[in-house]
């Protein structure tokens, strides 16, 4: 086949794959397929296979669906969805494949068999939640819809949904379980997707029948700034969004009202009110000490710390358990109460910690993943049930906080570890030799134990044995008669061989270490898993010496002696040397296994050095001439010596030739040497010019030079500016800095006593000499500074004083404020009728800020909202009250006390300067006397303005019925500003609520019109689409339709009180019956044995 024909063939195949296909070919190929064929096709993910499967699922009966589920069809779909989500959506084909796959899952859940199978088998919802880790918004929308439907379907589905969100939080390392929902809601601009997210929030809240659980779930969302998000979402003015937001707010207000009834009018969602109630409850009792200690401890918890959420969740669990035990621990002490608080989780937590230690060691050695269920003593550690509702990590942290401390260095466990999957995996092994110690962990060092030697032969000094850690490359002893290197005079003359070694060994004798023979007491045999996983060899027969086959590699790391050099090859136990051999040297055919290193154990890797035995001449090293200079390098790649030795190469043959070519090393050294650094001749020292003379320290000299450079003129001009009192080139900061740099007394004396050439002085010293020639230079600079400061202060304070005075007049002269306060007074007396706060003649002005704290029975309506509605209908002019307070709001934030302080302080400075000027030189008097007097006159006028403000403050206090000595103008203006903002916000809220009500009414009318247009049955009743869908088995679609409309959620929210009063089982059965419209729950397909194996492996 030519190249052109091959290209045409490839393009043709690609065209067939990418070109349009027949719809029957895409979706009709699985119309009558059996479950086995569908399972096979699912193993090849494609749009064609998923589309055909979706159509087959829609037309399947219960028997076909059961077979499909038993054959792990749902497992294949969820696994494929998880893998596709991990790819991202870099290609359109992957996005389409994800959508078709999730549509198959939705179609399967639409059937009774499918959704019941998912609800009754844990793990599927977790797998489904992992598909949220994708950038495909359509796929995430479908997954969230399925989670919302599961929450409403049954309590079991609600628990599985919460467990899946908790699992997703752990997998993605998020801080809160609902963060995935709120993060998507805040970052998305897709309105349908935001509607789905809000519906998930409502479904999670309405999925539980317990009031406290609903409030807790809702508060979790509120803690993630959901209320702020709802305010932004209302601005989008989408009908579906408004429905979900309205459902959330209505249910919130109804639950809050129910809580008020239960807790006697205490708003349990208000932190301050709950704390005040608790404080008043225990303030007059000894329990207040414990409350204070608890609060002090909570205050120490860092909110930004990563473990802070876990600590707060654990404390919440502990408090809930304490509430349950409050009536049943009268005769217990503190220790018994603590044991009861954690008794349900304490044992499992200990077992879990012990199991984790063991399995960690096993997993490190065998390099496998940690099983889900394992125990250290043959018992299975099971996870908490999903229905508990308490995060597992919180319980673990709670147990860790309350459990007694344990020693870190204690042995984890010494008994064999049995698991369900691998039979026998040992965390540690019991050694067969009685005197050998137990080793808890192969990775840990074991303390050495001294072993006394028997009398014959004499003991080796410093030979202390301990079971060594693995990983050391052992070194063998050279044959005698030479002494062991590194031992020096420590060894006595070699003793004669001990026949049999029987009298020196205990019974039963453990196997000897190679190279040690009978001179040392035997150490324990190698641990299983440390020496190739081989069992220890049997002990040698007496008198056999080195005739036994070699034992397995010995235990490395025998501490107490220095490691000997490597052995000479060929010195096996079968060819003993002429002198008597060391006992135990035999049994090792060449090359012998290395013996344990006898030095102190370190973590370094010891590499054995290659040496040669007697009678074997090693290859002589090549003789290389050493250059006398540093040479340039030749970049080559060396061939290993063993390669040259073992092969018939050119290098091996060239080395045997006698006639060799010698290079001219001297010429090479001259041509290829590195350049040498030239020796510098000693330079003749040059005389440095004499330095400038200065009487200032280096720091002050530098600062003064920097100060003078900013003028960019000679020093004489700066002095002339000071003499003339010209402030055009001086500002306040420069004058303050100038005062700090004035010469001190000793500097003045040194400069005046200097009689030599002035030109030799530094620039700073010369400036000081010029400055000293100006009479009263410091007083002149102080006068310039005070004049600048007073002019600036007057420009700032005078307009502020004017505005404050005007704000006082606005409050007193406003005719709308008294009318509004009279209206509030009447409403307040009506609400407080019969109480000690009723029948009031007036109220503090700060009460205006509390109008929003009194909430109505309807959502988002406070007392201020209602009063503004009344004003809008009956007193329209009062709506202009914010215009009367506009100037007052601008004054808020001005520090009036600071104005008094600055004015009085500057007046005092001016009087002091006047006294100094009166005794100064004549030219200074003429120059600054008038300026200082003008400043004093201006400050006196400002002081009169402040006095007028003080008088108006007294009038305002009398107008507001406040104490003049305690009234603060700053607080009064801030209160008016905050009230004005609340007034405007409530006015806007009323307007928005009316517009939303009009839209909601139009939508209701539109739905009612659609209901009337529907087809009617024989009895004249409307045939509802929901009932028809339920008969066809479309459970998910029906639930999502009700969630989208808000009808089911509103009905659930309105009947919460009745549902809480009913038994839990009754309400659950009623909910299930309403959803399924059948009197009996469908049968759940049994889990196939193969399916159980798959689940076990995945866990």
From Swiss-Prot:
It holds the Pfam family FH2. Keywords: Actin-binding, Coiled coil. GO terms for molecular function: actin binding; small GTPase binding. Residues 907-1019 form a coiled coil. Residues 348-359, 367-385, 1071-1083 have a biased composition (Basic and acidic residues). InterPro entries: ARM-like (IPR011989), ARM-type_fold (IPR016024), FH2_Formin (IPR015425), FH2_Formin_sf (IPR042201), FH3_dom (IPR010472), GBD/FH3_dom (IPR014768), GTPase-bd (IPR010473), WH2_dom (IPR003124). Residues 1037-1052 form the WH2 domain. Residues 1-330 form the GBD/FH3 domain. Residues 452-499 have a biased composition (Pro residues). Belongs to the formin homology family. This is Inverted formin-2. It comes from Xenopus laevis. The gene is inf2.
């Amino acid at each position: 086949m030519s190249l052109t024909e091959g290209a045409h063939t490839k393009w043709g195949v690609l065209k067939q794959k990418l070109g349009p296909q027949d719809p029957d070919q895409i979706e009709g190929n699985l119309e009558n397929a059996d479950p086995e064929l569908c399972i096979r096709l699912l193993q090849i993910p494609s749009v064609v296979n998923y589309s055909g499967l979706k159509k087959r699922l829609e037309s399947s009966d219960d028997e076909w669906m059961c077979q499909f589920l038993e054959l792990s069809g749902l497992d294949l779909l969820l696994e494929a969805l998880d893998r596709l989500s991990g790819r991202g959506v870099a290609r359109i084909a992957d996005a389409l494949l994800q959508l078709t796959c999730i549509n198959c899952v939705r179609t399967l859940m639409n059937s009774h068999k499918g959704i019941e199978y998912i609800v009754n088998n844990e793990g599927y919802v977790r797998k489904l939640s992992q598909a949220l880790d994708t950038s495909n918004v359509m796929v995430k929308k479908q997954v969230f819809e399925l989670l919302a439907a599961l929450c409403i379907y049954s309590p079991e589905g609600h628990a599985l949904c919460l467990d899946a969100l908790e699992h997703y939080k752990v997998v993605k390392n998020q801080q809160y379980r609902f963060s995935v929902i709120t993060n998507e809601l805040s970052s998305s601009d897709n309105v349908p997707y935001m509607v789905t997210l809000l519906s998930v929030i409502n479904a999670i809240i309405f999925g539980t029948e317990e009031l406290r659980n609903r409030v807790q779930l809702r508060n979790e969302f509120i803690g993630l700034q959901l209320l702020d998000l709802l305010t932004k979402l209302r601005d989008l003015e989408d009908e579906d969004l408004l429905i979900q937001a309205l459902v959330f707010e209505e249910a919130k207000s109804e639950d809050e009202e129910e809580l008020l009834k239960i807790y006697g009018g205490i708003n349990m969602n208000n932190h301050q009110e709950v704390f005040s109630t608790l404080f008043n409850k225990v303030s007059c009792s000894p329990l207040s000490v414990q409350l204070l200690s608890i609060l002090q401890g909570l205050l120490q918890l860092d909110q930004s710390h990563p473990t802070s959420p876990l600590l707060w969740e654990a404390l919440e669990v502990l408090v809930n358990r304490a509430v349950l035990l409050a009536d049943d621990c009268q005769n217990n002490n503190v220790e018994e109460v603590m044991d009861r608080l954690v008794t349900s989780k304490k044992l499992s937590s200990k077992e879990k910690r012990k199991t984790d230690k063991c399995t960690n060691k096993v997993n490190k050695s065998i390099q496998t993943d940690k099983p889900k269920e394992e125990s250290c003593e043959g018992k299975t550690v099971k996870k908490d049930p999903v229905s508990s509702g308490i995060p597992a990590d919180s319980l673990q942290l709670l147990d860790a906080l309350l459990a007694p401390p344990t020693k870190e260095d204690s042995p984890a466990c010494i008994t064999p570890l049995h698991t369900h999957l691998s039979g026998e995996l040992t965390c540690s092994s019991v050694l067969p030799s009685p005197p050998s110690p137990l080793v808890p962990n192969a990775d840990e060092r074991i303390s050495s134990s001294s072993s006394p030697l028997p009398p014959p032969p004499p003991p080796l000094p410093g030979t202390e044995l301990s079971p060594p850690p693995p990983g050391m490359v052992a070194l063998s002893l050279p044959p005698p008669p030479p002494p062991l290197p590194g031992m020096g005079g420590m060894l006595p003359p070699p003793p004669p061989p001990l026949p049999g070694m029987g009298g020196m060994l205990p019974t039963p004798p453990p196997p000897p270490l190679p190279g040690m023979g009978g001179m040392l007491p035997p150490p324990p045999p190698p641990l299983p898993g440390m020496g190739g996983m081989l069992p220890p060899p049997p002990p040698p027969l007496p008198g056999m010496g080195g005739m036994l086959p070699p034992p397995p590699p010995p235990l490395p790391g025998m501490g107490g002696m220095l490691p000997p050099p490597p052995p000479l090859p060929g010195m096996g136990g079968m060819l003993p040397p002429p002198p008597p051999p060391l006992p135990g040297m035999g049994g090792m055919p060449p090359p012998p296994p290395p013996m344990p290193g006898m030095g102190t154990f370190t973590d370094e890797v010891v590499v054995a050095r290659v040496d040669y035995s007697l009678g074997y001449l090693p290859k002589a090293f090549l003789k290389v001439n050493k250059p006398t200079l540093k040479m340039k390098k030749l970049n080559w790649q060396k061939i290993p010596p063993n390669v040259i030795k073992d092969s018939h190469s050119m290098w091996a043959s060239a080395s045997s030739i006698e006639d060799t070519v010698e290079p001219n090393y001297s010429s090479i050294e001259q041509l290829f040497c590195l350049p040498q650094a030239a020796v510098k001749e000693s330079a003749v020292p040059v005389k440095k010019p004499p330095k400038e003379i200065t009487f200032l320290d280096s720091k002050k000299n530098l600062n003064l030079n920097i100060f003078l450079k900013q003028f960019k003129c000679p020093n004489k001009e700066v002095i002339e500016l000071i003499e003339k009192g010209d402030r055009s080139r001086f500002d306040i900061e420069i004058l303050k800095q100038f005062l700090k740099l004035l010469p001190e007394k000793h500097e003045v004396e040194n400069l005046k006593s200097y009689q030599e050439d002035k030109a030799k002085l530094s620039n700073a010293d010369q400036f000081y000499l010029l400055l000293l020639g100006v009479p009263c230079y410091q007083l002149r600079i102080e006068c310039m500074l005070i004049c600048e400061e007073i002019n600036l202060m007057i420009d700032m304070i005078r307009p502020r004083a004017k505005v404050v005075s005007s704000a006082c007049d606005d409050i007193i002269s406003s005719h709308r404020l008294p009318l509004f306060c009279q209206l509030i007074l009447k409403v307040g007396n009506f609400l407080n009728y019969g109480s000690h706060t009723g029948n009031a003649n007036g109220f503090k002005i700060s009460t205006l800020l509390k109008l929003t704290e009194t909430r109505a029975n309807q959502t988002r309506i406070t007392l201020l909202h209602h009063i503004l509605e009344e004003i809008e209908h009956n007193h329209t002019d009062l709506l202009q009250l914010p215009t009367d307070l506009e100037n007052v709001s601008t004054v808020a934030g001005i520090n009036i006390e600071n104005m008094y302080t600055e004015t009085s302080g500057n007046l005092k400075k001016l009087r002091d300067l006047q006294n100094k000027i009166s005794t100064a030189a004549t030219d200074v008097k003429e120059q600054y006397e008038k300026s200082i007097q003008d400043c004093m006159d201006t400050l006196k006028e400002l002081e009169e303005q402040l006095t007028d403000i003080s008088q108006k403050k007294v009038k305002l206090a009398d107008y507001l019925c406040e104490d003049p000595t305690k009234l603060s103008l700053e607080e009064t203006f801030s209160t008016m500003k905050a009230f004005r903002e609340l007034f405007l916000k409530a006015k806007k809220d009323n307007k928005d609520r009316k517009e939303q009500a009009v839209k909601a009414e139009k939508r209701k009318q539109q739905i009612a019109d659609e209901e009337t247009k529907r087809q009617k049955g024989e009895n004249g009743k409307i045939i509802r689409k929901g009932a028809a869908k339920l008969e066809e088995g479309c459970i998910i679609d029906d639930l999502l339709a009700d969630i989208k409309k808000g009808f089911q959620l509103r009905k659930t929210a309105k009947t919460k009180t009745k549902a809480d009063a009913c038994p839990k089982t009754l309400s659950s059965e009623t909910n299930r019956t309403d959803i399924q419209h059948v009197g009996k729950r469908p049968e759940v397909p049994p889990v196939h044995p193969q399916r159980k194996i798959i689940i076990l492996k995945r866990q």
